[in-house]
Amino acid sequence: GPRKIAEILNKMMIKNLNYKEYCAQGGDWGATIANWLGYDHSNNCKAIHINCLTMRHPEGPQTKEEKEWQIKFDKDQIMQDGYRTQQATKPQTLSYAMLDSPVGIAAWIIEKMHGWSDLKDNNIESVYSKDVLLANIMIYILTNTFNTASWIYFGRREEGGRFFPKDFKKINIPTGIAIFPNEMSEWPPRSYVERIFNIK
């Protein structure tokens, strides 16, 4: 899962590339990995920058505003849970079907890019050219990596899901956050985020 990936990347930076200190930036899974770099490896990882909140405080929302955000977030996520549940519980079954079907991989990826993008008039080509769409699809087809890309969901579930450990201590390294217009998931109130990160 992403916590193990963070451990591997930290070792690579320190032992293979000989950096004593580094910063990490990530979105989506990269944000989750950056969170774990900041949490587990702050002796080496000196700052992180993320554009989505993928991890949750173990104590959950505390204020009325935070609780309202959580209710809205949970409601919004219902429409996204199908693919995540499949990949977090049965990634290999899905992978066998996809690796045998380029059209299946294309449909899976295009549906996500369509649903997660700020489209004009519901037209995916208002944001992505056919070349960009095909390049994304072909990366998975030509490298046979739909399978391995799916397993990170399973790994995160095995590592405890979206929540930091119950004995969580705030990530004290400087944290930068980018919030773009029309994000798929709305950020929680700043009070919630500041219980997790040292925002700069």
List where the protein language model places each region:
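Flexible loop/turn segments at secondary-structure boundaries
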Residues: 1, 30-33, 55-59, 105, ...
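Conserved structured core elements
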Residues: 3-7, 23, 27, 31, ...
